Amino acid sequence: MESQQLHQNPRSLHGSAYASVTSKEVPSNQDPLAVSASNLPEFDRDSTKVNSQQETTPGTSAVPENHHHVSPQPASVPPPQNGQYQQHGMMTPNKAMASNWAHYQQPSMMTCSHYQTSPAYYQPDPHYPLPQYIPPLSTSSPDPIDSQNQHSEVPQAETKVRNNVLPPHTLTSEENFSTWVKFYIRFLKNSNLGDIIPNDQGEIKRQMTYEEHAYIYNTFQAFAPFHLLPTWVKQILEINYADILTVLCKSVSKMQTNNQELKDWIALANLEYDGSTSADTFEITVSTIIQRLKENNINVSDRLACQLILKGLSGDFKYLRNQYRTKTNMKLSQLFAEIQLIYDENKIMNLNKPSQYKQHSEYKNVSRTSPNTTNTKVTTRNYQRTNSSKPRAAKAHNIATSSKFSRVNNDHINESTVSSQYLSDDNELSLGQQQKESKPTHTIDSNDELPDHLLIDSGASQTLVRSAHYLHHATPNSEINIVDAQKQDIPINAIGNLHFNFQNGTKTSIKALHTPNIAYDLLSLSELANQNITACFTRNTLERSDGTVLAPIVKHGDFYWLSKKYLIPSHISKLTINNVNKSKSVNKYPYPLIHRMLGHANFRSIQKSLKKNAVTYLKESDIEWSNASTYQCPDCLIGKSTKHRHVKGSRLKYQESYEPFQYLHTDIFGPVHHLPKSAPSYFISFTDEKTRFQWVYPLHDRREESILNVFTSILAFIKNQFNARVLVIQMDRGSEYTNKTLHKFFTNRGITACYTTTADSRAHGVAERLNRTLLNDCRTLLHCSGLPNHLWFSAVEFSTIIRNSLVSPKNDKSARQHAGLAGLDITTILPFGQPVIVNNHNPDSKIHPRGIPGYALHPSRNSYGYIIYLPSLKKTVDTTNYVILQDKQSKLDQFNYDTLTFDDDLNRLTAHNQSFIEQNETEQSYDQNTESDHDYQSEIEINSDPLVNDFSSQSINPLQLDKEPVQKVRAPKEVDADISEYNILPSPVRSRTPHIINKESTEMGGTVESDTTSPRHSSTFTARNQKRPGSPNDMIDLTSQDRVNYGLENIKTTRLGGTEEPYIQRNSDTNIKYRTTNSTPSIDDRSSNSESTTPIISIETKAVCDNTPSIDTDPPEYRSSDHATPNIMPDKSSKNVTADSILDDLPLPDLTHQSPTDTSDVSKDIPHIHSRQTNSSLGGMDDSNVLTTTKSKKRSLEDNETEIEVSRDTWNNKNMRSLEPPRSKKRINLIAAIKGVKSIKPVRTTLRYDEAITYNKDNKEKDRYVEAYHKEISQLLKMNTWDTNKYYDRNDIDPKKVINSMFIFNKKRDGTHKARFVARGDIQHPDTYDSDMQSNTVHHYALMTSLSIALDNDYYITQLDISSAYLYADIKEELYIRPPPHLGLNDKLLRLRKSLYGLKQSGANWYETIKSYLINCCDMQEVRGWSCVFKNSQVTICLFVDDMILFSKDLNANKKIITTLKKQYDTKIINLGESDNEIQYDILGLEIKYQRSKYMKLGMEKSLTEKLPKLNVPLNPKGKKLRAPGQPGHYIDQDELEIDEDEYKEKVHEMQKLIGLASYVGYKFRFDLLYYINTLAQHILFPSRQVLDMTYELIQFMWDTRDKQLIWHKNKPTKPDNKLVAISDASYGNQPYYKSQIGNIFLLNGKVIGGKSTKASLTCTSTTEAEIHAVSEAIPLLNNLSHLVQELNKKPIIKGLLTDSRSTISIIKSTNEEKFRNRFFGTKAMRLRDEVSGNNLYVYYIETKKNIADVMTKPLPIKTFKLLTNKWIH
């Protein structure tokens, strides 16, 4: 019935079977089916029969009779259903409209049946049937418009067969399927599809396109009716209707199996063997083929097998062809034995020295030579064969002499050859063999030798003997070179004659050579022929030309031999020629062998060791030393390769032709480690080739920007000062010189960059020697003066000045004289480190000292002054106001110079300079720790501020204090070695703002306690307004009580609002308390950091400063030593909740017990590195921002530990800004840029189609992306993403409803490659979606809360993934999308049916879909207020788009949910989580290690290890690791940033990329980095060098700590409640515009689950207000988390809030509402009170030292940072 339908309805047979794709035709020899399908003429016996059926006579159709090719039926006839094909849909639309098959793609020409659902397939027109010839895919088709007329008008007879492809015949029966497949495969190959047909292993050369897939599918079903297919084919098609390639693959495999006989014959006929594989392997291969044929009842005779084998022999084995050429009784075993013998011989030869070899020449194909010095023809006589094998003349090596061979005894020995010839018959022996170069025989084995006989060699041109016993008239060899047939040298020791005495008394003599390096003594027939002697091998005799028999010859083995009894001995007992002994023929060891045995030692070492008997059982005479000295071992050349020796003085001669300052040498030295950040770590030096003038410049880094600035400076200097132009600069190949920036700089200025060759730094000797000289001088100067190491560059600069002024030994002038400069004025030079006294012309008091000790460094670059180091102030100054200190060579000397004083000489030398001293000083300009004394004078203010210590009153009016002179403790004479650990840049002028000291708050607060310290608020971790260690005011003697009490009478406090409080009278009771920590003042500088005798003053007062409302003093119970404020809870259960219960199990730092008198402040910082114009950044404030300051105590160096070695220096715009004017500048204002930052723009991490596939040079990656591409297309079709029944014209659709589409590609974290077809939702019209719909995902806090609860309750955690989740959600709007690009349908549109990725509404649609399913089918409920968190009585689900995390006490409950999900969605189990051991998860980017009932570790080490190196940030993987993400005291320059437009965009993009990744990591689990991330994120639009440096430092810290994890441990099971705690902190006014930074950390049962650091939205006017703002930000989230915890776990919950602000706690507790200073503050405080009381919230005080939220609000010193974080992240 089906065949009848096919016969009646031809339209259904073709359809779109002819979809076209232009493709290269693959040659048949490259086809994977070359043997199995198309290239075997005997492949199928039925092929001739089928071909004959298709032959036609001329003028008739060449198409075979086919039931499919019949007259068309009316259009009303329904399309047929061709068997089972009709059950399935077809592929996606193809590119046929624009292809060569366009004339079959017209709507009236294409078939459209039920199984062809794609719009690409159409019905043929009833009046115009399909052509009988199918054009190949590469054939150009006619114009689609005129296709109908062409088909109707062109007769079939006129069709050109050469331009068409003959279609296969129709399958007629199931038995003929294998035959039909052969023709079908040929048909596809003729259609240029041969490279996509699989071979029998299923391998293909390339992936087919969808058009080609459609073409194969349709042609297969057109010519192979389903009911005639074999059963196995039907089974494949029922599983996958379009898997035609599997059918072809299995068909080919079956054909291969059925035709194994043919394969074996082909393999046997094509045998080849050249010795590259072992003979055994070859024998096994051949035997296996013959045995397989024998099993198929096909016997292969030995003769036939030998003939086939001999035909394929080559190389050394080709000789066997001649041996077996005439044999009729060849045995296969004998042939294999011969092959094995030759193989073994070659193997032995390859292991020995080339000059030694074994004479098995019957298996060697070597060239033969005979002399041509005589016309005597050498012939052979007939002989009788002694056995079945043909005897042959001995084939020895082809011995030839060189052209330098000298004549001996007036007989000249020449090299000659004879023409090659084959043996003509069995009775003729040729003197030559077929000429063929082969490998030499190196063995000296002579098992086949006949003792005391000479081997008669028909091919040797010379006679060679191994013993000199028979050699007459022997002379040493000097010029003779002998080579064998393989062109290998044979060393010759001596030359002489052999004298023969034959039977009849005939005597003759022939020339002979002596060498011990042959296997046999060779008698040359050519030499005998010269004496008219021939060999008769039939009678085995030597005869004269007249027939006289001279001697018999003996056949031994395969060779003929002559006895040595006919030789006349030379009667020489011992021959001394070349140490050859007659007693024995020495077989010496080849030198290469000994060289390898002795570990590739050199020639001289081996020879000397043998002479000294260092190696036993081996003598020097046992080794062949010829050519040993010139032997080149390949392994030694590779393994011992070294760079060439640099030739001294090899600089190019043309360098001398340059004028001064035209040719420069430059080099960089560094880094110098363990220095302060302000000190340079590198220097770059320049030397002029002509004058040898030298320059040095300090550098803090080696970045290309820094180097470029230096080059700009020196070129400008040379141009302006010397009127010269630099033409050439010679450098090494360091990256700082070879970068594109510097190369472009040189090119633009016409400067030639001359680089050294690779790994030849010695060629850069001028610059290298200068650096070495300068460093030698530096070490010497520092050692002599005793100055600290951070002044190393001052020593280098001093040395440069001196070296430029002195005459070098090779020159007659100094560099200065060569440059045309005057000589050095010695009166302007002081010894390096010379002690001086610097005048302080602006002291604070007239009675204070006017001089400060210092040490002279070098003359100033920018003034007539001198650079002098002041140890007491830890800085250098540029001044002329100094006096040389008499009788002291150096205050820092470690040596005794009592007898070496130079005071008189110095006075005499500097007398002229003394009169020049004035009071005008200038500031040193280059970036080294120097300032003019105008700057430091403001620092020398002895007791300029009122005497206030760390715990004085809240506000002290300095007008009420009378100044009293205090003795100043000077700095020690010797500078401590640890001074290099300090940050030595000076602070600017201090603010005259009165000090307002409060241990908690400097503006507003409640009670004051003398027993507590609050160092947090000491000027927001900047020391700009603090006294630094070592400053004069820190050394004030405070031993007198009267002196302390003086000035404390009648002190009145002043509020910022202008009102004054009553005077605080002097109180003799408890108002003032004194505590003495140490009664003995310390003289040591380091110990001076601790207090000597310091009164601790606590003033209790009801007055509240800073406009805070008046609050009653805390009752006595609140002033307990534990510093805990009672809870503010009205709940009756509050009596069971204590501060200890709240603080219990929190990861707070463990502090060592401190005595009540310990007032050290762990949060103070060392002096900061500042720039002149600053704004707040990482914890610092500008002077204009400072409202109040706090005078802090000094602390020990270990508390002030800072990062010095690795952290980067801040950017200095003055010195490091490029002098070259850019093309266009963009002015960036800091504040405007910060305001412009709305959010961190995500950086694109995906690839476009052209990046992933079209232009991807990584073929392996490209193939994976192509595979992912096809997989995505299949999934889209499977999910019915769009309507495949109809294409819509682009012009007929409203443009608002049209959505652009694109492919994006990316590589997932597990290494898989992903392709996704997405809509361009970013340009989607607002009318096409509901803006109220939201795409919800699980909040990170919800996930962390769920993980924490899972750990505490031993839950199983299961991870699932739903494939193509969005495509399960229908779309309601009428939207159209452009087809995928590979279809080429640019003017067509598809109607969307599913929520394609990228649409605005896709996320919301999917959320509603999965939410409905979870609620209705899985009995889940969504937790109120927490989207995407679902739960029922047993299971909790966290949903993030297509990722699901299941939590349950019972694993079976999770499995039940999975089963339900699989009914509707393609659900994949990523991790079931059933193991009791540690399980590793990758959940939303978090790498989690979880062991139930024990612990959970959260990190991102793998991800960071992969991603951070790709950021192009200069990481330092082997250097010292950073120990903190940033340092206190860093400031961002607030000057407007001038930058090129392109460079600005590039740097903004870089900042977005870096901060984007840092934010992702920080908010996942690295909460300790959030402050730095938030601060730097505000400067994304202000990418100055300083901002980038700070960002790089953050990335470096992330790299150094990438292995850190957030550690959780299971909560104690005895605790019945869940404890949720928020820890709050604020840093007042440390952000731009005086904004405060606030931070909160949230903990559940002692586990940190989240953190937040942000800038306060409103400007706070006091510290307390900032703290209130921080607390008010934490409470809402704390309440929401509380609700979530109660929903997920039904235990009771305790909520706690911890803050280190007592003022905030007092405001929350107080009921006084009258003195709130403004409405906003009052409403904020009132709301805070209501939230605390209404939510059962316990508020407690936490010490600042333990407040881990401190890391969220400010940068901290390393020790403090570690102390606060090491408990919860490590």
UniProtKB/Swiss-Prot annotation:
Mg(2+) 3 binds at residues 1625, 1667, 1700. Signal peptide: none annotated. Residues 1-11, 19-39, 49-60, 399-408, 415-435, 1009-1024, 1065-1082 have a biased composition (Polar residues). A motif (Bipartite nuclear localization signal) lies at residues 1193-1227. The keyword Nucleotide-binding applies. It catalyses: DNA(n) + a 2'-deoxyribonucleoside 5'-triphosphate = DNA(n+1) + diphosphate; Endonucleolytic cleavage to 5'-phosphomonoester. GO terms for cellular component: cytoplasm; nucleus. GO terms for molecular function: aspartic-type endopeptidase activity; ATP binding; DNA binding; DNA-directed DNA polymerase activity; RNA binding; RNA-directed DNA polymerase activity; RNA-DNA hybrid ribonuclease activity; zinc ion binding. InterPro entries: DNA/RNA_pol_sf, Integrase_cat-core, PolX-like_BBD, Retrotran_Ty1/copia-like, RNaseH-like_sf, RNaseH_sf, RVT_2, TYA. It holds the Pfam family rve. The active site is at residue 457. Residues 1353-1491 form the Reverse transcriptase Ty1/copia-type domain. Residues 369-382 have a biased composition (Low complexity). Its EC number is 3.4.23.-, 2.7.7.49, 2.7.7.7, 3.1.26.4. The C-terminal RNA-binding region of CA is sufficient for all its nucleocapsid-like chaperone activities. Integrase core domain contains the D-x(n)-D-x(35)-E motif, named for the phylogenetically conserved glutamic acid and aspartic acid residues and the invariant 35 amino acid spacing between the second and third acidic residues. Each acidic residue of the D,D(35)E motif is independently essential for the 3'-processing and strand transfer activities of purified integrase protein. This is Transposon Ty2-C Gag-Pol polyprotein. The gene is TY2B-C.
